[in-house]
UniProtKB/Swiss-Prot annotation:
Residues 1-19 form the signal peptide. PROSITE patterns: FN3. The chain crosses the membrane at residues 566-591. The WSXWS motif appears to be necessary for proper protein folding and thereby efficient intracellular transport and cell-surface receptor binding. Keywords: Disulfide bond, Glycoprotein, Membrane, Receptor, Repeat, Signal, Transmembrane, Transmembrane helix. It comes from Mus musculus. Residues 47-152, 152-258, 259-359, 360-465, 469-565 form the Fibronectin type-III domain. Residues 20-565 are extracellular. The lineage of its organism: Eukaryota, Metazoa, Chordata, Craniata, Vertebrata. It is a single-pass type I membrane protein. This is Interleukin-12 receptor subunit beta-1. The gene is Il12rb1. Dimer or oligomer; disulfide-linked. Interacts with IL12RB2 to form the high affinity IL12 receptor. Heterodimer with IL23R; in presence of IL23. The heterodimer forms the IL23 receptor. Residues 592-738 are cytoplasmic.
Amino acid sequence: MDMMGLAGTSKHITFLLLCQLGASGPGDGCCVEKTSFPEGASGSPLGPRNLSCYRVSKTDYECSWQYDGPEDNVSHVLWCCFVPPNHTHTGQERCRYFSSGPDRTVQFWEQDGIPVLSKVNFWVESRLGNRTMKSQKISQYLYNWTKTTPPLGHIKVSQSHRQLRMDWNVSEEAGAEVQFRRRMPTTNWTLGDCGPQVNSGSGVLGDIRGSMSESCLCPSENMAQEIQIRRRRRLSSGAPGGPWSDWSMPVCVPPEVLPQAKIKFLVEPLNQGGRRRLTMQGQSPQLAVPEGCRGRPGAQVKKHLVLVRMLSCRCQAQTSKTVPLGKKLNLSGATYDLNVLAKTRFGRSTIQKWHLPAQELTETRALNVSVGGNMTSMQWAAQAPGTTYCLEWQPWFQHRNHTHCTLIVPEEEDPAKMVTHSWSSKPTLEQEECYRITVFASKNPKNPMLWATVLSSYYFGGNASRAGTPRHVSVRNQTGDSVSVEWTASQLSTCPGVLTQYVVRCEAEDGAWESEWLVPPTKTQVTLDGLRSRVMYKVQVRADTARLPGAWSHPQRFSFEVQISRLSIIFASLGSFASVLLVGSLGYIGLNRAAWHLCPPLPTPCGSTAVEFPGSQGKQAWQWCNPEDFPEVLYPRDALVVEMPGDRGDGTESPQAAPECALDTRRPLETQRQRQVQALSEARRLGLAREDCPRGDLAHVTLPLLLGGVTQGASVLDDLWRTHKTAEPGPPTLGQEA
């Protein structure tokens, strides 16, 4: 067809019309002579990109690309141009195109006329309406550029030392490069390199079912991961031999450390059958997984289990059993460990541990134990025929590693409905210590969850009477007729249920009195009352068991003395002090009164009511010595002399000087009073009397009296002062006689 005859027609449209007239290959392609087509990309951010063409098998080839832009009504065309082998001398290129519509992959083979041993130029055109977008052109030798396949089968994942190891089978020869990418629920994709797969290190493992195996290592995390693998052919020179393969299907792995569960275990007490019900409540934790692992196995926990391990009676055939989480259990009173397990692709992981301690029967059941020499025998009530028993004993307060147990299968039924077990080899129960003895029974001894507790008891081995004797008995006075007795706890008290009581015996050494007190095993003190003073007593203590009484302790002697309480001593001391204080106060007051009467105080002229002058004195003199009474004029000081008329008794004068006055006290009292009144009148006339002298105060007036050995009554002087009147101030008259 002459293309020049289609003048004015678009070359692309003309080319498409020609291809419609030609034959089409399997890839819906058309081969034409090269015309002038655009050589560069469209330059737009939209359109096809990352074109890659490669060989996928011996005869099959493929080209793929990516596209950015609207997906509706878009069509893609793959162009491939080459020089035919028989036109190498002319250099004339021929082109072929493959229309893929909206798909971004084109497959073809050698029969489509594409040379695979020579260079071929490829590009993609994407048409959207009247717009055409073109990719970058690539040149490729198809036969040597091979794209490998990703791991298509099962990828085995294992975990060790905080690393994940992935292994898979490949059908072609080894020699590929391997990469991985991973992401977690909170992170984006992270690219990692597995390195070349060679016959060393973590490379080829060997032939598995006629194929080769490859492996890759990547870090393990505490979160769920999504991992994908891709491969690329690697030449012997180390250069890449093809593009990267597609990513494999997601490989989902759980976290290395699973979150802890919060399961609550509820345990009921032992029932009459020797079993207790265990109920589990709560939900197992849910894991967060990446987007590609939602709904896919691998990252999630497959199931949750509970591992029940019976720590008691380890001589049984099987000591543990696994049950689903949430199942109600009926367990014996033995000690158990319960582990909550999470089953993942890596196996079982413990996410919670719980310890169930042993529980004893509420009622006491008889256990007969006898030890003689190297022979130890035990006897207890039998259960139903065909029952297997597990006898366990261990020293109390010791590690469980010292536990001894034995399985007992009675051959024939005892008429007395008793089970007897004896052994003559060690260990025996002859040491002086506490033993815990438990008997379990089961119809199915191979299942550790079907045992029941039929007997639990404690036994103190050796000579319990001697070992249980209380030590360090002491006696202390308490009240007037009682004492307190104390002692250290018996060694039997460390063995639950063995010590039944203490017995305290007190007796007088003269044999006149004796009594005993029963004390509970939890107490180590008792008060003894009803005792007498000044009597020698002795007290002893013993510890009794249910089987036999204990041995008496060493006697403790004491003499009961009446003691005075401290409060009485305090009151007596206070009374003595008060008595001394009272006697001292009374004595002081009595001495003061006696001194007052024996040595009265001197009379005060201003305060007395009378002054008696001796009758033998004929004169009476007063002297005022205070100059403040006469501030204007100062006169020579002289004494006032008053001469009393009358006869003198003895005719003698007082040995005082002339200004002094002597009064005759031998005259009658009335005569003396008259004379005193006259003397007072004379003193008033002279202005020598003062009313400003306070009563009882002689600080401003000096009145020397010539008494001659006889003192007048205080009433006379008092009358003188009472009749005194204040005179007008004036110059005093000295030396005037009455």
